[in-house]
Amino acid sequence: MARKSLIQRNKKRQKLELKYHWIRGSSKKEIHRVPLLSDKWEIYVKLQSSPRNSAPTRLHRRCFLTGRPRANYRDFGLSGHILREMVQACLLPGATRSSW
């Protein structure tokens, strides 16, 4: 189980990212549209003034049961060992253990 403070910090980052998502996206599009370098610098300053944690690269994909940040499977939203346990207990429909 991950520390609760880390999980809360990640949730706070997700909220910030949602809040600034449109602003960051429109600024980046505007950079490519504006031909003058001086105007581009103004837009860059505007982008850099947004909070650091509002960038999507600061987010971690975490297991929604344990909060573990590593070995996550996107399709299920689970970490590897929880996924394995759930497949063995037949709790995930359509998932089978491989055997060869």
UniProtKB/Swiss-Prot annotation:
The keyword Transport does not apply. One of its GO terms (molecular function) is structural constituent of ribosome. Disulfide bonds: none annotated. InterPro entries: Ribosomal_uS14, Ribosomal_uS14_bac/plastid, Ribosomal_uS14_CS. It is found in: Plastid. Keywords: Plastid, Ribonucleoprotein, Ribosomal protein, RNA-binding, rRNA-binding. The keyword Plastid applies. Its main location: plastid. One of its GO terms (cellular component) is plastid. Gene3D superfamilies: 1.10.287.1480. Binds 16S rRNA, required for the assembly of 30S particles. Part of the 30S ribosomal subunit. This is Small ribosomal subunit protein uS14c. It comes from Cuscuta exaltata (Tall dodder). The gene is rps14.
